[in-house]
Amino acid sequence: MPAARKRELTTPDLVLLSLLAERPMHGYQANAELERREVRDWAGISRPQVYYSLEKLAQLGLVRTSETELPAAGPERSVFQTTAKGRAALADTLEREEWATHRERPPFLTWLALSWQARPGVFRRQIKRRREFLENELSREEATLRSIKQEVGHRFHEAVWMVSLMIGQFRGELRWLRKLERELPRRAHAKHTVVAVR
């Protein structure tokens, strides 16, 4: 891997820089806190990735090992904290334009585009699966929101805004699915198909 790519900060790197700016932690604590915060709902970061990122960030001087009363036992017991250089790198990365201009490609939309090729009955079954999934996720996020509000003590916090956005998106998609089910009997092929010509 080229050196420039190794220095490029990934989402897991940024999540850890932010977490370790709050307070020093060792890898196990960081994993436990990320799990408690349900970070995997909004950032792709696995347990092994935490340790890989900690090592990378330490090599780049973006985190440092702090003193601990625990005996040295490898990365599990090394306590890391974000350095001033790490906070600056995080702040610089958060200014990039692509945070606000990237468009997601949800797998369900890909499925919908290809669904006209599905066997009879599959469309309705998949819509039902999607609806059930969204209803479960909505319930889970509503419970998460109650928990967050209790923990932070107000509604003007990033976590509240993030979960509120997800709740709004789930509700919006559920409304759209109901509309889709109503319109399904009228589904038809395109009337004016255009083919690209070289």
Where do the model's predicted regions map?
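Amphipathic alpha-helical dimerization/coiled-coil segments
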Residues: 91-139
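Amphipathic alpha-helical coiled-coil segments and their boundaries
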Residues: 120, 127, 156-159, 163, ...
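Long amphipathic alpha-helical coiled-coil segments
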Residues: 183-198
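Basic helix-turn-helix/winged-helix DNA-binding cores
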Residues: 1-103
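Acidic interhelical loop/turn segments
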Residues: 143-162
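Amphipathic alpha-helical coiled-coil segments
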Residues: 170-183
